[in-house]
Amino acid sequence: MRLLSFIYLVWLALLTGTPQVSATDNGKTSDVAWDKYSLSVKGERLFVFSGEFHYQRLPVPELWLDVFQKLRANGFNTISVYFFWSYHSASEDVFDFTTGAHDIQRLFDYAKQAGLYVIARAGPYCNAETSAGGFALWAANGQMGSERTSDEAYYKKWKPWILEVGKIIAANQITNGGPVILNQHENELQETTYDSNDTKVIYMEQVAKAFEEAGVVVPSSHNEKGMRTVSWSTDYKNVGGAVNVYGLDSYPGSLSCANPNSGFNLLRTYYQWFQNYSYTQPEYLAEFEGGWFQPWGGSFYDSCASELSPEFADVYYKNNIGSRVTLHNIYMTFGGTNWGHSAAPVVYTSYDYGSPLRETREIRDKLKQTKLLGLFTRVSKDLLKTYMEGNGTSYTSDDSIYTWALRNPDSDAGFYVVAHNTSSSREVTTFSLNITTSAGAMTIPDIELDGRQSKIIVTDYSIGSESSLLYSSAEVLTYATLDVDVLVFYLNAGQKGAFVFKDAPADLKYQTYGNSNLSALETSQGTQYSYTQGEGVTAVKFSNGVLVYLLDKETAWNFFAPPTVSSPTVAPNEHILVFGPYLVRGASIKHDTVEIVGDNSNSTSIEIYTGDEHVKKVSWNGNLIDTRATAYGSLIGTVPGAEDIEISLPSLSSWKAQDTLPEISPDYDDSRWTICNKTTSVNSVAPLSLPVLYSGDYGYHTGTKIYRGRFDGQNATGANVTVQNGVAAGWAAWLNGAYVGGFSGDPDKVASWEVLKFNHSSLRSRDNVLTIITDYTGHDQNSQKPIGTQNPRGIMGATLIGGGNFTLWRIQGNAGGEKNIDPVRGPMNEGGLYGERMGWHLPGYQVPESALDSSPLEGVSGAEGRFYTTSFQLDLEEDLDVPIGLQLSAPAGTEAVVQIFMNGYQFGHYLPHIGPQSLFPFPPGVIKNRGQNSLAISMWALTDAGARLEQVELKAYAKYRSGFDFNRDWTYLQPGWKDRTEYA
């Protein structure tokens, strides 16, 4: 029987020109299956159009739904999500999945509500430019042994995490009515030894078993770290540890913020890669470039035009389609914020990433362009089963054009993806394309590519129950099967388009409404309709009932096809068409009214096509708007914006200041601090001196650390001090209250070795106190030598010069250490500055009368520190979304460490001498858009030149009238001050 089946498959392959592969499942569930073409969910093929989202980087659960609605509206049907162990586990065997933004059940619920599937990525290791790559920081002090191997010490640490988070993932699988369709094992773990006894192979088997023990049954996946190794594919040297669906990570842009002409070189070898190494599986780009992170001292995202360009999305993402990719995840789609101390040293506070959705949750043109592809893939079911018919420069009349040619073996639908062969080219090229259709071979003339532009030319393409295109040189945005078949095309304004209906009558009549005039030409293959794309919306009504919309690209950016169902899969008869607004979050039809929920910055016209003759009215965010009916069946009106609203943000005044470095004084009482008395470390990196001064050995992992070392005698002339707290992290030292040196931080140095020079007059015969305060930019990721995430933090070594030894060291860090005394904000929010330990940054803190009337604009005159607090009131209108940030600047040459706390959340780490970030946004929920807000700024000078700011100002990024409810009681996310004197 197997032989007969094999013969049949060979015969079928010869007949269709492509191998046939039956759908496969993992033996645990058939709800999610796959073959060489695509993933299938509940028996239906799915183009996975996914966006990467990290809930930890947006600590307001209600706003997760805001982001999800924006992704859904812009063509996405899936989100890919990291779950950071570090965020949920402040100490060993303690997990928080319920408090505030730690409640990941809400994540799954909101994803389902928005109509998005979920790809779960819980590690244990995640990387993601987050501190320690997502490992729990209590475990990253060296006690994990050889991380990301089968080392027993490591295994005992990570397994409880996977079991705990795995149970929640399992409960939210599609098999249980939830949105999870794939579960990733580990992250970019490179398989270098193909041996079943290899430690990495054993480790991957352990991870698989742990997820299985937790109840996860959906297919497993992994993400290859670029085309450097071949890892964990069942189709290549499978000795164990392989996953069900192999994925590849790729960031090919090589773009430069400083030079917009550099990079932009397409990689055209994805198809070959997948054919070599995962040929029985669908092509899955588990992470594809949606932007790129920026380091300390680098560029700020808003100024990086090359990363923000919609051209990248147009050319690169369509190239992936041409490569037969059918699982496509964009990393990042929304980046968010590295608030608190959650960043790895390679990034600063903002994790905007240059992503399609800005850190402020605003829609960039890049997302609008991405939407055009998302909506196309949503309805193009024939794209989900194609073979590579060919590729190269021979398909066109101009060899400067490269073409991918895909063919569906069942329907013969064709997809020709064209772009400049030199993808960085800015030339305008007009050419003819040779195509194959059911009516034979033919040539489409007058196709134009304007520099960095790509197009998908379709043939034998179904656009409804009774209509098809023989071909079109205009790009299909979407189509709908409503009362009639409705087709939406787009082109750049001024470009020519042509299309032919398949098997349509030759004498079709049509009426045009708009700026693009259509002409008809009889050909042997049918009537060709040609036009030059004008600006705005043009509608063409054909006598066979088909309605065609012709849009210029910028108009298409503000086109939406809101589904009328909640499922991530949307059939052509399950959405309506809306033109004009900034955002359409959703739409529904009730009786004679179409109810639309959306956002608008400026008043715009709106056009709605529902295909329902009973619909006569339009409601926008609950309010009826005046409309008129068009001759072709749509309704047109105007929806309001926010341009008439004046946003007046309060000036920041009435500052109070207190000393946040009282520990500088030799008389400071540190008797309750942790004594550094260890002579051996759990860390394999040997300390440079004893006792061990690694902060992690004493339970302090995040933020500022303060050390006080004591010694006797007046012989010491200085000290050798080595500090390692991440790139760009500085530190300063005081002897008996006098500044003696330090290091201002360097974005190129992971550690610093400094010689402190003592003034003899500052020395005492007994009980000298050397106070060292260190900044912190995060724990390293796995790739940083020598031991990755477990590289020690704090003082690596400290010895006296000139005679004598330290007699006692004490350390202080974040209040409570691993106790997680503020579970809502979580274990990475605070550091060890005195003001933080005392809770001066928290709402409700009452400033004592002894506090100074002083602002950050006055600053400090020497090597000192201040903690500044003030409050302000906001009273924005209830239907407004106004992203707000804090703009800082400092005089040139200022070397200081500045932190911003909004209602208790550390939402800004500002190093004016390193940069680049100086504007720090706060999402609603961290800031109250209606109510009293508490703002605190900590600042300490890294040198005796002092420090001050010259600008501290609230800034509004933009304003939108919104159908989303931002007018909420955020109190539960902003717990207030409680007495903390025990942590002094």
UniProtKB/Swiss-Prot annotation:
Keywords: Carbohydrate metabolism, Disulfide bond, Glycoprotein, Glycosidase, Hydrolase, Polysaccharide degradation, Secreted, Signal. Its main location: secreted. Substrate binds at Y82, N127, A128, E129, N187, Y251, Y353. It comes from the Eukaryota. It is an enzyme of class 3 (hydrolase). Glycans are attached at N197, N276, N391, N421, N434, N517, N602, N677, N715, N720, N759, N805. It catalyses: Hydrolysis of terminal non-reducing beta-D-galactose residues in beta-D-galactosides. Belongs to the glycosyl hydrolase 35 family. This is Probable beta-galactosidase C. It comes from Aspergillus oryzae (strain ATCC 42149 / RIB 40). The gene is lacC.
